[in-house]
Amino acid sequence: MSRIYDCADETARKDGIADAASAVRRGDLVVLPTDTVYGIGTDAFSPTAVARLLATKGRGREMPPPVLVGSMRAANALVDDLGNHGRDLMEEFWPGPLTLVCTATPSLSWDLGDTKGTVGVRMPMDPVALDLLKEVGPMAVSSANKSGQPSATRVEEAVEQLGDEDIAVYLDGGETESRVSSTIVDLTYAVPRVLRAGAVSIEQLRAVCGTVIGELRRGPRKPARSEGAEAEDAGEATDPEPRAPREEDRGAPGTAPDGDKN
């Protein structure tokens, strides 16, 4: 039976974060608010827990989740190469709705899915999420919805879709502030490349990086295979038909074409 904590109450918030932290350390799943939509998360370093997260959403290994962190230091430990502009982008837009796809540190013992050696990293601008992340460390987080269903902007919507059997703790942070997904930028190229347009505009990115390759659309838009990743990551909440993935997008955490908006 899931436990739900109203984080508007200070005592409940403290108890909820402690309970959620214990659940994450056990390899259980929790639901938490972010600055985009609600997320379903677990220990990024537990392959069993990540597999359970994907199964609960109805998603395969070809759609690995991005990783949320509570500090730049935590992100630096996950990333082998930030490229020429990664640090500047972090300093300008974190915490906030910008996911950076980078080459992952090869020595890490984890299995997020078919990542092709990359990791999508983001530091959300949400106090409840940050408190939990600082307590437990990096979490694999996907949008708190079943594949093919709308993303949740209220905890009640997440409960309705995910139920109380697979989720140990729900942290209720109220309605999320934005329905717009995070912008995803691939830093594994010499020139930063936008994989998905979102809350951070390409003009804002270019003000920091200079040259940025915009999101490419090849041919007519096709229905997504499952949902509409960080719905964690392929279009806005108001966009029911996210773009089909390009070959270079496949496997990068947070770029799955299924509606994840985290």
Q: What does each model-found stretch correspond to?
A:
Residues M1-N262:
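Active-site-adjacent structural elements in enzyme catalytic cores
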